[in-house]
Amino acid sequence: MNIGIVCYASVGGSGIVATELGCALAARGHQVRLVSSELPFRFGQYHPSLGFHPVQAPVYPPLREPQYLLSLANKLVQVSRQFSFDVIHSHYAIPHAAGAYLARQILGASGKDRVPKIITTLHGTDVTLVGADPSYSQTVAFCIDQSDGVTAVSKSLRAETIRELAVGADIRVIPNFLDCDHYHYAPDLDLRARLTRDNPMTKLIIHVSNFRPVKRPKAVVDIFRQIRAHVPARLVLVGEGPELGSACQNARDLGLGDAVEVLGEQEHIVPILSTADLVLLPSANEGFGLSALEAMACETPVVASCVGGLPEFIEHGVSGFLHPPDDMKAMAESGVALLTDDFLYRRTVQAGRDVVCRRFCTDAIVPRYEDYYREIVEHTE
């Protein structure tokens, strides 16, 4: 099939999964073109069936800001005409599903172009934050309902979309996935020595995110403070975002500034996750929780909030630990238990790795997208 994939290029679950999906589909013989504002973060090595097309939104003085939606629709029309897309797969409802909808209307109006089917994948904040905002909610609901097919990355997100936006679309759940050959235990001993300052007794606690408010990075610092009262540890922050600075300031205010290491955005996350002893994810909500799945694949235990899609792959006390978002004391207690009980630690990381390998590897999930593409194309021809 000829497939266009629209996504964000930044470090975040939706863009990472969209790019990994594009790479996997190309490897399986499909012609895939990625469309985004810039080269996606996880865009890998060259493949003859995979290409990238940037969207450029020029600035004109009469307009208050760049019109990315219109530029995106225009680019999708151009690339679809060139490659005769069977499907345009939009990851994240706004603005990508809206851009795909406009492109489909333009192609259909010409009377001579192939009109692709539009599939929208919902990832989380496109529904829970953007979609819930009255300024966007009707547009988001319209774009979802106008899609030929809709998927969500978790059962929780599907239920929340129906409840909050009252959409009529049939939403298929297809979860996120990982290349399980790539995501495995592969620690970097030199990195560990640097981060622990050559102290073999020091544990490394890590948080990976885009540092938006929903990720609650200040809560990460507070949980770390409580764990550190019982276990010698340092906190490693991976990623960039609006709340990173305030989280670091919070650590300094608590006298923990010297115990925090900021690594910024990192393309090669496997050795970092494998080097850590514990991952904290106290989010207010998670459409899926890809960073938790990545940690489990790398045999690093996760303590997280019992929200969104996380309970759909983390079983509390078995493959990880889940607590209400505001119960930071319980999260800290679970962290201390893992870091001081070797049997519990090994049992948890093995169970986590087993869950990933059984249910969330590329070969288990990508064929479900292929089947869904065929179903939508054949059903609506």
Give residue ranges: language-model regions.
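Nucleotide-activated donor-binding/catalytic signature segment of Leloir-type glycosyltransferases, i.e.
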Residues: 248-264
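Short hydrophobic beta-strand element within catalytic cores of glycosyltransferases
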Residues: 301-304, 314
